[in-house]
Amino acid sequence: YPTRTERKILKDNKTEIANEIGKSAVLIEPGAGDIKKIAIFLSSLDKPKKYIPLDISEDYITKLSQGFKKKFPKLAITPKGYDFSKNNKLPFKIKSSENIIIFFPGSTLGNFEKKDAVKFLKMLKSKFKAKKIIIGVDLVKDIPTLISAYDDKKGITAKFNKNILQRINTELGGDINLNSYKHLAIYNKPKKRIEMRLKSKKNNNIKINGSKYLVKKNEEIHTENSHK
């Protein structure tokens, strides 16, 4: 539901969003991904000046932006490779006098611990000299709905969660059998967050970077949080 619901919110409120953003905006989207969400309200804006989508993969975001430029030919689009989580120097110049708007949808903020989320938001405001920030966050709701979103019947989230094991195999010389682990999505009520874990189905002897480890049967690897 998160992506579907967020798209609907943006569509239903695009006029109000445009009014809040104002005229001649410079839109910056950290972790832009497929850049589809900003397209929902972009045509409603009053003469936007520039759109800067940022992604950790510059090749990916550059290729994706080519089609975006055809859809919005009058808009200056400058894709850049940038890992916003590392707080590195920006790969472009910005002016504090400009109407800079940060667009950060997708409830990615929920992946941070609370103190880190506050720190991250302060960084966005200061580093990007943002006038306003549009953030997507997921709300607390009934537990079955939350669980089903992170343990979907199609197994999309499970595949995403297990991808970290595949990356260990590819990048760190691992020999992990992905089928030996079960994807879990658990709601931690006191901390108001979904916890994604990988549960070992049996005793697994694994190798990472030449070192050997034992992951015991039913032992859980805590991979990610999504705070609500």
Predicted region positions:
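Substrate-binding/catalytic lobe of Class I Rossmann-like enzymes that use SAM or dcSAM, i.e.
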Residues: 147-228
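S-adenosyl-L-methionine
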Residues: 68-93
